[in-house]
Amino acid sequence: MKKTTYLLILLCSLLCTACVHSATKAALGKLVGSDRDEHGCIPSAGYTWSYALHDCVRLWEAGMRFDSGPQQIFLVYSTDSTFAEIFPTEGKSIICKRVKSTNSWKNKKGKESVYINNGIVCVKMNDFTYTQKK
């Protein structure tokens, strides 16, 4: 009787240990921050790829916020100010190239543009002009 009880307890212990191990393994497979995009950025940590900066950035840290329009957008300049990159709330970012000897950047494919008017940064996108808050 003691041997049977001992074997039953041993069997239950092994089963419980196996269940805990598989649950732990499943949890480790989905760690926060383990997701990476094609550029190596971690979206769950707030990072997105910037073509203007050629780096993973957090938009609220590296960019200028514009929320005076129908959607919130962010603007990031390249280090040499050759490019301005617009990040809309939805969709892909939009690259605008600087027009020589001016304070304006234009997108070749669309109507989007960035310009500085009397020291105020303006972003024109989807027939709406976003202005920087002071």
Describe every region a protein language model picked out.
Residues 1-5:
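Positively charged n-region of N-terminal signal peptides that target proteins for export
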Residues 9-12, 34, 49:
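Residue-level signal for mature regions of secreted extracellular proteins and peptides
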Residues 15-18:
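C-terminal motif of bacterial Sec signal peptides marking the signal peptidase cleavage site
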Residues 20-31:
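Short, low-complexity, disordered segments immediately C-terminal to signal peptides
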Residues 35, 111-134:
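C-terminal partner/receptor-binding element of secreted or periplasmic proteins
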Residues 39-44:
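Disulfide-braced loops of extracellular cysteine-rich modules
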Residues 47-54:
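Extracellular, cysteine-rich, disulfide-stabilized repeat modules with beta-strand cores
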Residues 59-103:
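Mature extracytoplasmic domains of secretory-pathway proteins
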